[in-house]
Amino acid sequence: MQAATADSISVSNKSQNELIPFSQFLESLKEKMKQVFHVRADIDQLSLKRGLPPFVMREIMSVNPLSVGIPTQYGGRGGVMKENLGLLATASYESLALSLTFGINSALFLQPFGKFGQDEVKAPVFNRFLNDKAMGGLMITEPDYGSDALNMQTSYTESGSKYHLKGKKHWAGLTGWADFWLLSARQQSKSEKLQRDIDFFLCDVTAPGQNIVVEEFFENLGLYAIPYGRNHIDVQLPQTHKLVPETTGVKMMLDLLHRSRMQFPGMGMGFIQRMLDEALTHCKERMVGGKSLFQYDRVQHRLSKLQASYTICSAMCANSSEKAGLDVDLSSQGMEANAVKSVITDLMQEAAQSVVQLVGAKAYKLNHIAGRGTTDSRPFQIFEGSNDILYAQISEGLVKMMKRAKERNLFQFLKGYDLTDKAVHFVKSQVDFNLDLQIPQRKLVEMGKIIGRVISLNQVLDLSEKGFNKELIDGSVAFLQQEITKLMSAFNFKNEEKVVDGYDENTSWMNFVAG
C-alpha cells in the first residue's frame, strides 16, 4: 500500500462509480437477491448449511453494496447514514445474516476506518472493496474478556517502523473470510504492564507478517452464513496502520460502538417487516374452526404488536439517519445508543417468537423463515453489549444525571430531558414518583428497560410529526404504554430473593408422594 498511488486510485474509482439514485441502487440489490435466493437457489435450503455458495456472494457483491460505507472521494456513496440503514433494511428482509454481513463491513470497519484511518492507506483499501469485493471486520472480544473489554490482554509494542500485536480474539463475525480487520490492543510498557487506553490497527491478512491464524471455527447456533471462531494474533503492522483518535482510544471505541448500535434498527427493519408480512399472510390463509386465524381476537393482538414493532423500528431508523452521521462524535451518546440497540433487538426476538407461535409446528424448522429467525435474531441481544448490561448502563446514566440536576422526581426529570420530553406526558401516571437513587443492580436492569421504551416512544412521536401513518403511530403508542406499565409493575415489586446454597437438600419431590 503506497501513498503515491492514492490519488490515482481515488480518481479512478470516482470516474468508474458515478452515483446512481439510491432507489435504483436498492432495486439492483433486490434483483440480485431474488436471483440467488429464489431463482438459482432456495434460501430456505441454503440456510441449512454453514457459509454460502461462492456464486451467492459473488452476485450480490457485483452491485457494490458496501460502497454505501465508502467516502465519495474514494469512489463510494459517501457513508450517508440514511443509505446505510436502507441497505441493511433491504438485505434483512431476505436474510438477517446477509444484513449483518453488510453491517459488520460498514459499521465496524468502513465507517471507523474512513473516520480515523490514516489518509495514506485509505485509497488502496477502499479500492479493494470496490474493485476486488474485499470484506472487513472488527476484533475486540477475547476469550476471557467479553463485556470486560477495557481489560483486554491483546498487547502491542513498537519496534522500529512496526507495531507488533499479540493476543487472542474470538467471536468476530466473518472470521476467516474478511481480508481486512480492525484489531484492538493495549500498549505494553517496558515494565510489561498494559496501558489503560485502547488503540486500533488496520490489519491486511493478505500482506506479509499480517496473517491471522484461525484456531477454531465455532458451531454457532444461528446465523449459519457467517463464520465465527477463535483467532491467534501475532502480526507486524506498519505505522500507517494505526488509527488516529480525536482524543483517546477509548472514546474512539465508544464512538464506533455507539454508531454501530444506532444502526441496529436498519437490520431490524427488514427483519421485522418480513415477520409481519409472513404473519399476515399465514393468518389470512389459515382456517381454524371455520374462520381464518386473522379473525381471532388474540391473533389480532399479536399482529398489532408486530405492527407496533414495525412502527417503532421505523422511528428509530429515521432518528438514527438524522443523529448518527460520521461527522458526529457519538462517544458521549451512550444513553440513546444503548436504548436503541437493546429495545430493537428485544423486539426482533419477540417478533420471531410470535410468528413461530402463530404458524405452529411448521415454523419449528431451520428452513422456515420464522424458525430460523428465532435463532438468527437471538445473538443480537448479546453481541455489542449484552442487553442486561446496556439496560443497567442506561439506569446508571439516568441516576448520574438526576443527581447532577438535583432532581429526584422521575417525571420532572424526564420532562426536561431531550430524549424523553415528549413521551413522558403519555406515561405520567407511571413515572410520576420520587426515585430512590440507590438502585439495586437487579432493579437497574428493570428501570433501564423502562427508560429505553420511553426513549423509543419519544422517537415514535417525532416520526408522527413527520406525517407517518397515524393508525400505526397510535398502535405503537398504546403498545409502549402497556409495556412501560408492565415493566413499572415489576420494578415496584420488591423481590430480594437470592440463590439457596445446597438447594438439593430435602427437595426430591418423589419423597413427598405416597407409594
Where is each model-derived feature located?
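Amphipathic, small/basic residue-rich leader segments at the start of a protein or domain
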Residues: 1-104, 111, 116-131, 429-455, ...
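C-terminal helix-coil-helix/basic helical segment that borders enzyme active sites and/or dimer interfaces
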Residues: 44-46, 310-343, 356-357, 465
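FAD-binding core of FAD-dependent oxidoreductases
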Residues: 95-111, 129-145, 168-182, 219, ...
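FAD-binding glycine-rich core of flavoenzymes that anchor FAD
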Residues: 115-143, 156-163
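A short core secondary-structure module
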Residues: 168-212
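Glycine-rich beta->alpha junctions and the first turn(s) of the following alpha-helix
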Residues: 218-309, 378-383, 387, 402-465
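Generic structural signal for well-ordered, non-transmembrane alpha-helical segments
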Residues: 270-273, 277, 301-311, 338, ...
